[in-house]
Amino acid sequence: MTNVCDLTDRKCKPCEGGVPPLEMEEAEKLLKQLEQGWQLADNKISRTFSFKNYYQTMAFVNAIAWVSHREDHHPDMMVGYDWCRVEYMTHAIGGLSENDFICAAKVDMLFKS
């Protein structure tokens, strides 16, 4: 079974469509490997992170941008003064792929550091 260490050690694989999204059962298994707070709904996973101030929020957003660039897999983000909501979905397949969970695990690791 995949665990968080496995997910953070993996690299995203290019996905340009032509493969089906993860089945709900597999997505739920992978969701259990992430930190608490991630929600699975509407063919995406999302989590809202809270911070003490705007500077910490923006530092986190920029760190996510760096990880996203390295993985070539980008989330949708909504940002407020002391919060950031991160949503992953593989748009090319209209649902979730393992890439979404790999990146979510890496975002969790960033938040803990």
Swiss-Prot record:
Keywords, comma-separated and alphabetical: Lyase
The protein's enzyme class: lyase
UniProt keyword Calcium, yes or no: no
InterPro entries linked to this entry: PCD_sf, Pterin_deHydtase
Pfam families, A to Z: Pterin_4a (PF01329)
Gene Ontology BP terms: tetrahydrobiopterin biosynthetic process
Enzyme Commission number(s) from the entry: 4.2.1.96
Reaction catalysed by this enzyme: (4aS,6R)-4a-hydroxy-L-erythro-5,6,7,8-tetrahydrobiopterin = (6R)-L-erythro-6,7-dihydrobiopterin + H2O
Family matches, as Gene3D superfamilies: Transcriptional coactivator/pterin dehydratase
Gene Ontology terms, MF aspect: 4-alpha-hydroxytetrahydrobiopterin dehydratase activity
HAMAP family: Pterin_4_alpha
NCBIfam families, A to Z: PRK00823.1-4
Official protein name in the record: Putative pterin-4-alpha-carbinolamine dehydratase
